[in-house]
């Protein structure tokens, strides 16, 4: 069947979106394979090798002018320094949660994230919430509240992941720097701390790459690919798809994490988690229905 250029572009965008969110969803398999390495050490390798790969990509794409332009814009420079701290913290919490058998909490965090984004948009960008959006956010809050009050536990990992990534997304939206340039500068800001840790501070059986097996070293170097490849797929998808369309793929990642946690790694799906997940899933269904209704209304208005 013949497809127009726009349809071909949209099809490519859908494939890129599925690829990006699938890679994010199965990333825990990679981090589980590095279970013998400390979270801080994995984070440091992630920063170093992501920086190296991004530097190569920027050089090949002749994008150094874009990098220099951001560095010479104080507002963007300092905001990127803040986003570097946020994404670094997010990466560290995520790596720790996977290797400490808290993958369900990580999954919950990324389910909560779209709802938190709506709330942050209202608080900091002047966006107005529709009634169903309010209802969805309230349901999510009730789910977390029940876990706190009835079961006496707080999903700290989930809240930390959702909050750090939510504020990261908010600031990156304000900065308006392309993903590749932004992530390159963020890893550049984190590079000194990562290098100091790996060279002088790390004192573990895996910290000396000269003594590691080549298989382990290859896994550590692949941290750059694991970080950068899904991001490139995501930015390619974002350039080809409407934001509303892209939004429906964002649940692939946490859903795959959830399935991995329960079916592959045997994490306990306890009653407190089940209730919280039920409320979050219900909130996301309402959130998605509201998005569909808003999209149809906008098309009719045109």
From Swiss-Prot:
It comes from Vibrio cholerae serotype O1 (strain ATCC 39315 / El Tor Inaba N16961). The lineage of its organism: Bacteria, Pseudomonadati, Pseudomonadota, Gammaproteobacteria, Vibrionales. The chain crosses the membrane at residues 13-32, 42-64, 77-96, 106-125, 132-150, 154-171, 183-202, 217-239, 246-265, 275-297. InterPro entries: EamA_dom, RarD. It is found in: Cell membrane. It comes from the Bacteria. This is Uncharacterized transporter VC_0195. The keyword Nuclease does not apply. One of its GO terms (cellular component) is plasma membrane.
């Amino acid at each position: 069947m013949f497809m127009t250029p726009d349809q071909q572009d949209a099809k490519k965008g859908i494939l890129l979106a599925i690829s990006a969110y699938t890679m994010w969803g199965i990333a825990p398999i990679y981090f589980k394979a590095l279970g013998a390495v400390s979270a801080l050490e994995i984070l440091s390798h992630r920063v170093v090798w992501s920086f190296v790969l991004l530097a190569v990509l920027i050089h090949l794409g002749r994008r150094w002018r874009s990098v220099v332009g951001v560095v010479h814009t104080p507002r963007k420079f300092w905001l990127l320094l803040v986003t570097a701290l946020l994404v670094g913290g997010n990466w560290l919490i995520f790596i720790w949660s996977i290797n400490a058998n808290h993958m369900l909490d990580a999954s919950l965090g990324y389910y909560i994230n779209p709802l938190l984004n709506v709330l942050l948009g209202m608080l900091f960008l002047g966006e107005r919430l529709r009634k169903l959006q309010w209802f969805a956010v309230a349901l999510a809050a009730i789910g977390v509240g029940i876990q706190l009050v009835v079961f006496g536990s707080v999903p700290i990992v989930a809240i930390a992941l959702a909050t750090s990534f939510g504020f990261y997304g908010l600031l990156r939206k304000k900065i308006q720097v392309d993903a590749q340039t932004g992530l390159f500068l963020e890893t550049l800001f984190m590079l000194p701390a990562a290098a100091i840790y790996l060279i002088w501070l790390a004192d573990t059986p895996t910290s000396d790459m000269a003594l590691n097996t080549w298989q382990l070293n290859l896994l550590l170097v692949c941290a750059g690919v694991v970080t950068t490849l899904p991001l490139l797929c995501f930015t390619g998808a974002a350039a080809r798809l409407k934001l509303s369309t892209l939004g429906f793929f964002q649940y692939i990642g946490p859903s795959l994490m959830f399935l991995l946690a329960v079916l592959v790694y045997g994490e306990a799906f306890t009653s407190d988690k089940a209730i919280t997940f039920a409320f979050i899933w219900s909130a996301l269904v309402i959130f998605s229905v509201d998005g569909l209704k808003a999209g149809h209304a906008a098309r009719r208005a045109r």
